C-alpha cells in the first residue's frame, strides 16, 4: 500500500528523532544529533551527505547531519577544515619560470612550488592568450581537456561542465573516455551483459535480505564505501546492512567475504571470510566453474536459454584448448592459496541455494581487469539465478544508493556541457591531423611520452597527439593516475598546464597557471538527494561568501568567455540564482502530475523536498521473463560467454572468452615477488572521498601516524622486519618510494599491505625520484593498461618492499600553500 506524502514525512521525522545508529557508526558519529531549531542552520549537500551548518559573523562554527540522514558519516567533520584549510588557493598564481618565459619555460621546474601572485585579469588574460596560441599555431589536437574526476556536488556548479562548455566555445580539443574507478568493467560488461552495470541500479536490498540464502561480497566493502555518492548521499543502505548483521547473527543467511583482507564489512557483519591470494580471483572462479560442470551442478537450461558461447568456452575450462591446462580445483589451489576441496565445497554451496554475488570494483583495477567481471558473469550464468529475486550478480552494491529503490522522480538537470544548438566555437577547426580526438583516460601519461604512437583500444586504433597544453578543473590528476615519477617526466612535455581548484593539490603544484575556485560551501546550488534512490532535491545554500580572492567556476569561465565575445552565449544571460531556479523549475515541471514540488521560493526557504521510496526491484528480471522481448544490449541480445566481437579484434591479452592471464607482477610466488614480496593494495579510503578531505587536519588526526598516511601491515611481517605500530616505514619499488606510518593489524595477511588511495602526493622536491613525504600509493603503482580492450588503470597490480625508516624524516610538504615569490 502506498503511503501519502504527509504520512511519509511524518514517518521520516519520527525515524530521524528516534533511530539508533548502527554500532559501526555510533563511535564515529557521537557528535551527530537531530538538528533542533533548524531555521537557525543553513542546509547544503556534499558527496558524503546533506548537512546543516551554523554560521556566525560570516564563519561556519558548527556542522550537523541533515535531520533525515539516519546514518551520517564522520566525514562531515572535515567540512570546516575544507573551507578554512591552510591548503586553500587564495589568489590567482602563476609559476615563476612560466611567467618569465611563457611556453618556453623550463618545465622540469614544475613542482618546485615557486609561484607569483597575479590579478584575476592578468591570470585570465594569460589563460586566454594560451588558448589563442594553441588554436592559431596548432589546432584542436594540441589541447587536452580530459577532465575525469569527482568534482564537488551541485548540478549547476559542475566544474567539468563549465570548463568543457567555455573552452568549447573557443575551440575544439582532445578529451578522454572511461574513468579511473571502473575503467575495465565499463568496457567489458556491455559486451557480456549489454550495459555498463557498474553504474546501474541493482536489485533492491530489501529483496536480497528477504530472498538470498547465500550473499557473497567479492572484493566488495559496502560498510566502508557507502559513505559517499556522486550526488548528495542519503546513506539509506546502512539500515539494510544493520538488518543483515542481525540475520547473520541469527544464522538466517550465509554471508561470505572473498578478499585478501578482512574488510570493514566482514568485521561489522561478523560473517565468514574466504582468503584468496591477491589478483587470483579469475583462477578461483574458473575452478568453481569447473566443479559446477564436472559435478553437473550448473543450470543447463539457463545456459541454453539465456547465453551464447558456452560451448566455445568449455574447451578452455576443460584444458582442451589454449594452454591445455585443466582449470580444476587442484590447479587453482596452487595459485589462490585455497585448498582444492574447499574450492569444490564453495562451488557446491553456491549451487545449492539462492545466491547473490556482489562484486566490488577493486578486482577490475588491475592488469587484465576485464577478466574477473567477465568470468564472474559466466559463474553467475552457470548458477542460473540471474534475474531471480535474491540471486544473480551485482557490480555496484557498495556504491552510492544502488539497491535503494528509485522514487521514480525526475532529478534536477545540470549546467549544459555542450554548446547550444546553432552555436559555433570561435575556432571551429575539426582537423586533428590524424590524431585521435578521444583517448582512454588512463593512458594520458603514455600519450605524453609517446606522441604519434598508435595503440589498440576497444576495437579501434588510437593515435596519440603531441599535446602542448592541458586544463584541469575540480579534479586531482596527481592522485588518480599511476606512477608519479613517470608522470613528472611526461608532464614536462606540456608547454602549459592550467588548473582550477580550491586547494593546493599536487595537480596544482605541477601546473603553470592556478586559479582559485571557491568551495561548494561558498556558492548557491541544487543537487539530487540520493544518486540512484532519487529521494529528493537538496538546496545547497551558500554558507559563507567566497574566501580570499576565490570565485565560482561559473564566474571564472564567464569572465574567460568575455575575452572572446562568448560571455552571453556561455551563461545564456542568467546569473547563479537564476540558473539554480531554472534547474529546479524544470525538474518541478517534469515531475508535475507525479510528485508535488513547491514553488522555488518555498523550496529554497525550506531547503529540501523529499519523495517516498520506490517499489523494490530485481535486476534482469524482465530479461529472464522474456529474453526476446527484453533482449540485452549485447550483439546477440543474450549473455555472451563467448564474444565474437572481442574475438574478432585479435587481442592477445583479451580473447573471445574469459581466461586466466598471469600478471606482470604478483605476490605470493608470482612474477617479481622474489624482489618485491609485498602486494600493495590501494583501496578507497575510509575517511575521505579519494583525495577530497585529505587536507582536513581534523580527519587526518584520526588516522595518520606521525602525520603520515597509515600503511596497514600484518603483525608477523612487522615483527620480522623490526617494525612496531607507530613506526615510520619506507615503502618502495623501482618506480618510487614514500614515507608512511606503520599500522599493525591482523586484518591483513602476510605479504599484503594497504595504503589508501587519495593520500596527497607530497614529494620532497620536484626532481624525478624524490621521496614522497606523506604516502601516496600511486607513487609506486604500475602505469600500464589493463589490456588492449579497455586500456584501463592497473593500480592494484603493484608489488613493493618495505623497511623501517631510520633517521630524521623530512617534513610533510603537501598541506600548505606555495612559496610566493616576486617576479
Curated annotation (Swiss-Prot):
Its EC number is 1.7.2.3. It is found in: Periplasm. One of its GO terms (biological process) is anaerobic respiration. Mo-bis(molybdopterin guanine dinucleotide) binds at residue 181. The keyword Oxidoreductase applies. Its cofactor is Mo-bis(molybdopterin guanine dinucleotide). It holds the Pfam family Molydop_binding. It comes from the Bacteria. Binds 1 molybdenum-bis(molybdopterin guanine dinucleotide) (Mo-bis-MGD) cofactor per subunit. GO terms for cellular component: outer membrane-bounded periplasmic space. Keywords: Metal-binding, Molybdenum, Oxidoreductase, Periplasm, Signal. One of its GO terms (molecular function) is molybdenum ion binding. Predicted to be exported by the Tat system. The position of the signal peptide cleavage has not been experimentally proven. The keyword Cell membrane does not apply. Residues 1-32 form the signal peptide. It catalyses: trimethylamine + 2 Fe(III)-[cytochrome c] + H2O = trimethylamine N-oxide + 2 Fe(II)-[cytochrome c] + 3 H(+). NCBIfam families: bisC_fam, PRK15102.1, torA. Reduces trimethylamine-N-oxide (TMAO) into trimethylamine; an anaerobic reaction coupled to energy-yielding reactions. Belongs to the prokaryotic molybdopterin-containing oxidoreductase family. PANTHER family: TRIMETHYLAMINE-N-OXIDE REDUCTASE, TRIMETHYLAMINE-N-OXIDE REDUCTASE 1. This is Trimethylamine-N-oxide reductase. It comes from Pasteurella multocida (strain Pm70). The gene is torA.
Amino acid at each position: 500500500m502506498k503511503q501519502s506524502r504527509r504520512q511519509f514525512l511524518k514517518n521520516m521525522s519520527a525515524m530521524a528523532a528516534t533511530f539508533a545508529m548502527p554500532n559501526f557508526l555510533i563511535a564515529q558519529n557521537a557528535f551527530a544529533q537531530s538538528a533542533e531549531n533548524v531555521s537557525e542552520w543553513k542546509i547544503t549537500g556534499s558527496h558524503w551527505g546533506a548537512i546543516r551548518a551554523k554560521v556566525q559573523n560570516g564563519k561556519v562554527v558548527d556542522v550537523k547531519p541533515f535531520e533525515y540522514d539516519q546514518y551520517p558519516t564522520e566525514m562531515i567533520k572535515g567540512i570546516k577544515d575544507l573551507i578554512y584549510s591552510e591548503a586553500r588557493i587564495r589568489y590567482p598564481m602563476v609559476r615563476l619560470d612560466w611567467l618569465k618565459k611563457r611556453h618556453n619555460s623550463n618545465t622540469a621546474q614544475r613542482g618546485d612550488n615557486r609561484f607569483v601572485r597575479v590579478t584575476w585579469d592578468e591570470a585570465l588574460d594569460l589563460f586566454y592568450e594560451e588558448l589563442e596560441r594553441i588554436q592559431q599555431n596548432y589546432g584542436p589536437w594540441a589541447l587536452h581537456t580530459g577532465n575525469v574526476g569527482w568534482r564537488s556536488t551541485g548540478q549547476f556548479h559542475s566544474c567539468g561542465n563549465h570548463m568543457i562548455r567555455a573552452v568549447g566555445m573557443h575551440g575544439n580539443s582532445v578529451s578522454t573516455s572511461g574513468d579511473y574507478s571502473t575503467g575495465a568493467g565499463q568496457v567489458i560488461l556491455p559486451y557480456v551483459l549489454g550495459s555498463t552495470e557498474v553504474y546501474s541500479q541493482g536489485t533492491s536490498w530489501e529483496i536480497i535480505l528477504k530472498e538470498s540464502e547465500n550473499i557473497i561480497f567479492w572484493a566488495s566493502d559496502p560498510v566502508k564505501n557507502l559513505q559517499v555518492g556522486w550526488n548528495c548521499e542519503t546513506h539509506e543502505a546502512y539500515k539494510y546492512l544493520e538488518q543483515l548483521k542481525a540475520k547473520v547473527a541469527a544464522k538466517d543467511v550465509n554471508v561470505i567475504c572473498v578478499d585478501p583482507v578482512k574488510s570493514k564489512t566482514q568485521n561489522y557483519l561478523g560473517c565468514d571470510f574466504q582468503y584468496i591470494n591477491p589478483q587470483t580471483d579469475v583462477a578461483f572462479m574458473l575452478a568453481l566453474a569447473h566443479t559446477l560442470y564436472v559435478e553437473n551442478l550448473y543450470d543447463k537450461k539457463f545456459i541454453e536459454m539465456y547465453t551464447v558461447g558456452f560451448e566455445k568456452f568449455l574447451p578452455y575450462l576443460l584444458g582442451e584448448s589454449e594452454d591445455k591446462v585443466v582449470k580444476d580445483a587442484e590447479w587453482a589451489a596452487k595459485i589462490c592459496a585455497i585448498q582444492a576441496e574447499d574450492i569444490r565445497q564453495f562451488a557446491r554451496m553456491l549451487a545449492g541455494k539462492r545466491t547473490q554475488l556482489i562484486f566490488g570494483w577493486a578486482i577490475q583495477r588491475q592488469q587484465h581487469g576485464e577478466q574477473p567481471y567477465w568470468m564472474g558473469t559466466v559463474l553467475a550464468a552457470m548458477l542460473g539465478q540471474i534475474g531471480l529475486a535474491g540471486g544473480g550478480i551485482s557490480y555496484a552494491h557498495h556504491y552510492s544508493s544502488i539497491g535503494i529503490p528509485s522514487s521514480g522522480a525526475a532529478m534536477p538537470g545540470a549546467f549544459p556541457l555542450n554548446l547550444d544548438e546553432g552555436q559555433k566555437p570561435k575556432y571551429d577547426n575539426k582537423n586533428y591531423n590524424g590524431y585521435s580526438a578521444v583517448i582512454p583516460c588512463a593512458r594520458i601519461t603514455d600519450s605524453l611520452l609517446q606522441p604519434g604512437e598508435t595503440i589498440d583500444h576497444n576495437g579501434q586504433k588510437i593515435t596519440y597527439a603531441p599535446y602542448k597544453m592541458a586544463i584541469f578543473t575540480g579534479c586531482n590528476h596527481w592522485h588518480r593516475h599511476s606512477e608519479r615519477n613517470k608522470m613528472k617526466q611526461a608532464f614536462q612535455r606540456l608547454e602549459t598546464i592550467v588548473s582550477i581548484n580550491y586547494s593546493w593539490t599536487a595537480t596544482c603544484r605541477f601546473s603553470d597557471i592556478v586559479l582559485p575556485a571557491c568551495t561548494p560551501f561558498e556558492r548557491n546550488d541544487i543537487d539530487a538527494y540520493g544518486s540512484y534512490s532519487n529521494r529528493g532535491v537538496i538546496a545547497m545554500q551558500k554558507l559563507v561568501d567566497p574566501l580570499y580572492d576565490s570565485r565560482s567556476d561559473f564566474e571564472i569561465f564567464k569572465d574567460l568567455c568575455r575575452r572572446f565575445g562568448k560571455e552571453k552565449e556561455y551563461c545564456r544571460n542568467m546569473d547563479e540564482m537564476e540558473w539554480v531556479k531554472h534547474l529546479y523549475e524544470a525538474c518541478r515541471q517534469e515531475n508535475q502530475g507525479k510528485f508535488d514540488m513547491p514553488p522555488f521560493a518555498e523550496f529554497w526557504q525550506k531547503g529540501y523536498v523529499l519523495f517516498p521510496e520506490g517499489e523494490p526491484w530485481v535486476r534482469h528480471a524482465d530479461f529472464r521473463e522474456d529474453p526476446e522481448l527484453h533482449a540485452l544490449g549485447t550483439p546477440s541480445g543474450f549473455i555472451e560467454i563467448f564474444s565474437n566481437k572481442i574475438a574478432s579484434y585479435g587481442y592477445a591479452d583479451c580473447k573471445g572468452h574469459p581466461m586466466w592471464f598471469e600478471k606482470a607482477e604478483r605476490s605470493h610466488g608470482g612474477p617479481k615477488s622474489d624482489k618485491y614480496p609485498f602486494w600493495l593494495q590501494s583501496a578507497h579510503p575510509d575517511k575521505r572521498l579519494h583525495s577530497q578531505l585529505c587536507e582536513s587536519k581534523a580527519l587526518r588526526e584520526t588516522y595518520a601516524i606521525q602525520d603520515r598516511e597509515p600503511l596497514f601491515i600484518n603483525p608477523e611481517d612487522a615483527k620480522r622486519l623490526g617494525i612496531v605500530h607507530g613506526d615510520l616505514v619506507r615503502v618502495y619499488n623501482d618506480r618510487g618510494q614514500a614515507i608512511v606510518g606503520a599500522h599493525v593489524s591482523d586484518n591483513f595477511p602476510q605479504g599484503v599491505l594497504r595504503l589508501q588511495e587519495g593520500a596527497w602526493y607530497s614529494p620532497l622536491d620536484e626532481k624525478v625520484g624524490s621521496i614522497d613525504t606523506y604516502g601516496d600509493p600511486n607513487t609506486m603503482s604500475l602505469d600500464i593498461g589493463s589490456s588492449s580492450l579497455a586500456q584501463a588503470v592497473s593500480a592494484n597490480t603493484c608489488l613493493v618492499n618495505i623497511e623501517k625508516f631510520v633517521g630524521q624524516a623530512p617534513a610533510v610538504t603537501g598541506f600548505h600553500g606555495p612559496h610566493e615569490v616576486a617576479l
